Amino acid sequence: MPHSHPALTPEQKKELSDIAHRIVAPGKGILAADESTGSIAKRLQSIGTENTEENRRFYRQLLLTADDRVNPCIGGVILFHETLYQKADDGRPFPQVIKSKGGVVGIKVDKGVVPLAGTNGETTTQGLDGLSERCAQYKKDGADFAKWRCVLKIGEHTPSALAIMENANVLARYASICQQNGIVPIVEPEILPDGDHDLKRCQYVTEKVLAAVYKALSDHHIYLEGTLLKPNMVTPGHACTQKYSHEEIAMATVTALRRTVPPAVTGVTFLSGGQSEEEASINLNAINKCPLLKPWALTFSYGRALQASALKAWGGKKENLKAAQEEYVKRALANSLACQGKYTPSGQAGAAASESLFISNHAY
């Protein structure tokens, strides 16, 4: 029998649990604004705007300084390294802006995906080297949670046992290092929506992946109450011809979570996985209305599904600032309702809100 060598003091555990609960308090979710410089380039390019540091700063400021209606909706904001050290026009560092609105500051700490040799195009995620030192510095600079993304693909022979095991272990090492530094880890094992697989296949793979992730977290002595999970919803592949209702997607998603995610986990913050803004809200709402026992907060950690309409409305023009913020506020309010099972689609979502945000083989 293994002997217990406590990884964390009671004080450390309380701090981690408190942070996790603040992020997913009722009605709150996460704004994922942690696109890498390469990823934000694609977003800016789509509106004909140059990818300069100032444009990136201005756009992030637009989101972070939206009016106080978003305060009850946004429990945390995930930033990219560059953004953590940028300032608003009034001279306040962005972390201070986020905290002044009741949000917790998060930071993306992985260094991207790399190929796993000998597999059919599968990947693992790099960034463990020097992570402890980086976490210690980020904590000093105001960040209280972190995100690390692993990616798995559904194919005829994927995900392989190797890819599942390797990614589960790298997530567990990352989580351990974060917790030692007082940072709540968001564990993100994303199963991509690419492919023609049906709902059942996605559910099966999601269950296998999550079971492996929580086995690894246990092996690495992770304090689950001080973690959040950022999974995909269980959906059919983008090329699947069969159509499913929002209720079927919700039932498959909640069932997969119930079979694999311990109730000790504080919250589940779904990624939007290229769903349209409207679809991401409707599915989140259906998940929260699903008639099964759900012991965790079930909320959002959306990037494009909170930003797409705002980005379009902004169009890279300073004079569109207010209009863009209005679009962002709309989505934040919609998702705040959805994570409480109280969202009723108005039926008048703009064209941008209903547009699929799917990017094949999506790499941040």
Swiss-Prot record:
Annotated SUPFAM superfamilies: Aldolase
Annotated catalysed reactions: beta-D-fructose 1,6-bisphosphate = D-glyceraldehyde 3-phosphate + dihydroxyacetone phosphate
Location of this chain's protein in the cell: Cytoplasm, Myofibril, Sarcomere, I band; Cytoplasm, Myofibril, Sarcomere, M line
Known outcome of mutating residue 188 to Q: Reduces activity over 1000-fold
Post-translational modification: Asn-361 in form alpha is deaminated to Asp in form beta.
PROSITE patterns for the chain: ALDOLASE_CLASS_I (PS00158)
A GO MF label: fructose-bisphosphate aldolase activity
Family statement drawn from the similarity comment of this UniProt entry: Belongs to the class I fructose-bisphosphate aldolase family.
NCBIfam families: FrucBisAld_I
Name recorded for this polypeptide: Fructose-bisphosphate aldolase A
Organism lineage string: Eukaryota, Metazoa, Chordata, Craniata, Vertebrata
Gene transcribed to yield this protein: ALDOA
